[in-house]
C-alpha cells in the first residue's frame, strides 16, 4: 500500500524536474553562502621580489660601500701627501715604534743572557724591623689617602651629596688637589688636574715600597743581611742534595 502511494509522487518528480526543491537542500545551500571563506596566512609569492633581485641588490650595495671606502682612503692619502706636518707626524710615529721594538728586543736579549749565565736568587730587601714598620705604615697611609681622593672626586658628580660627608673630605683633599690646579688646562669645562695629582701620589707610593732596602756601606766591607745568609744556606743545602744522587750512582 505504501509503495503504491509513493508511486504517484515519484512520477510527478520525474515528469516535473523544475518542481519545488526540498527544504534540506535549501538550508544546506544557504549555510554555504552565509559561511565566510577563511583566508590562508600564506604569503602571496607573486608579491615577493625574486631571489636574484635581492642578491643583486646586496651585491650592488656592497660594491658601492667598497668604492666609497676606497675614495675616502684616496682622499685621506692625497690630503696627507699635501700636508708636510702630517707626514712628519707619521714619520715620527713610525720611528718611535721602531725604537720601542729595538729597546724591547735588546732588553729581552739581555735578560736571557743574564739568566743563562748567572743563577737567579731572590732576596728580601731590608733587615731592619723599624724600617719595615715605617715603610709599611707610609704605604698604608698613601693607599688610604688615594682612596679618599677617589671618593672626593666621585662625590663632585653628585650636587645633592650630604654636607656631613663632603665637608670633611674637602678639608682633607682640597689642599693637596689645589697644588696641581692650573697645570693642565680644562677640557670642555672638565678639570683634568686630578690626573696629575694621582700620578704624583702613585710615584710616592712606589718610592715608599723601596724605603726598607739596604744600601752598601761606604767602607766597602759589606756584611750580609740575615735574609741573604738564610738564602745562601738554603742554596748550599739544595746543591748538596742535587749532588748526592750523582755521587751514589758513581759508587
Swiss-Prot record:
Biased composition (Basic residues): 232-243
GO cellular component: chloroplast thylakoid membrane
Major subcellular site: plastid
Location of the protein in the cell: Plastid, Chloroplast thylakoid membrane
Record note on disruption phenotype: No visible phenotype under normal growth conditions.
Keywords carried by this UniProt record: Chloroplast, Membrane, Plastid, Thylakoid, Transit peptide, Transmembrane, Transmembrane helix
TM annotation in the entry: 119-139, 183-203
Function: Not required for the biogenesis and accumulation of native cytochrome b6 in the thylakoid membrane. Not functionally involved in the pathway for covalent binding of the c-type heme to cytochrome b6.
Protein name as catalogued: YlmG homolog protein 2, chloroplastic
Source organism: Arabidopsis thaliana (Mouse-ear cress)
Organism phylogeny: Eukaryota, Viridiplantae, Streptophyta, Embryophyta, Tracheophyta
Gene: YLMG2
